A protein has these predicted regions:
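N-terminal Rossmann-like NAD(P) cofactor-binding module of classical short-chain dehydrogenase/reductase
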Residues: 52-53
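Rossmann-fold NAD(P)-binding glycine/threonine-rich loop
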Residues: 59-74, 78-101, 106, 110-119
């Protein structure tokens, strides 16, 4: 993901790639041949940076995002697995720069979350199936969690799960806000996919989004890099930047 972000930033006429961080390839040139990869964000000269993009893991992101706040640098964060306590800390820390945390930077995925929120009041039952590559370490995905939250906020009249017996424990998935069930699939060959299934008397509605490769996230990431300076504090989701 980091290489794809570097390439997208370098290809954008309004952005300049000034640094990259990856302990596994420190000392090498980045995938665009523009900058030498650093071992740690502490090795980056903060005076050269306006915006930092973080796609790591939650533990590393906590340190990287705090570094941005400490140096007055805007942060665009796509790392999943962050907790509500992290958001509280970030809101307190970002006083001289801004931070965007988004569960998904694919425009279609952002629209899917909005459509699910719109549909929620009209259907008493719903379930989410999220499918990702087999290197994803957290479940459910951040996109699924955000979708659940928005659906639960849009309606409080969800039907109860009728299942009384699970022959295999956990076969009904996990239970999210509003009692909505969520199922996580991890398979080789996948990138990032999500289905939201709604049901009511005599009809169903299925919303689905598929990211077929990582290029699907790049337009959202470069948009965020260019717009984050106009959104004070901590913003959750790409919705505000898209005006939806």
């Amino acid at each position: 993901m980091g290489s794809a972000v570097c390439e997208a930033v370098a290809a954008d006429d309004l952005l300049d790639l000034v640094g990259a961080v990856d302990p596994s390839s420190s000392g090498d040139m980045d995938s665009t041949g523009t900058v030498v990869v650093s071992d740690s964000i502490e090795d980056v000269d903060p005076t050269e940076v306006d915006v930092a993009v973080d796609f790591t893991v939650a533990e590393a992101a906590r340190q990287n995002v705090q570094w941005c706040a400490d140096h007055g640098i805007h942060a665009v964060v796509g790392t999943s697995g962050l907790l509500e306590s992290d958001l509280v800390s970030f809101r307190a820390a970002f006083t001289s720069s801004n931070c965007l945390i988004a569960p998904n930077f694919a425009i279609g995925a952002v629209l899917l979350m909005r459509f699910a929120e719109m549909a929620a009041p009209f259907f008493p039952t719903a379930e989410i199936i999220e499918l990702h590559h087999d290197n994803k370490v957290d479940a459910p995905s951040g996109t699924a969690m955000r979708t659940l939250e928005r659906m639960a906020q849009a309606s409080n009249e969800w039907g109860t799960d009728p299942t009384e017996l699970e022959t295999i424990s956990g076969s009904r998935g996990g239970t999210g806000p509003g009692g909505i069930q969520v199922h996580s699939v991890r398979l080789r060959g996948l990138v990032a996919h999500q289905e939201v299934l709604f049901g009511t008397d005599g009809e169903t509605l299925t919303l689905r989004h598929d990211s077929l490769d990582r290029s699907s996230f790049m337009n959202g990431i470069t948009l965020a890099c260019k717009a984050i300076s106009e959104h004070p504090g901590v913003t959750i989701g790409l919705d505000t930047l898209l005006g939806i």
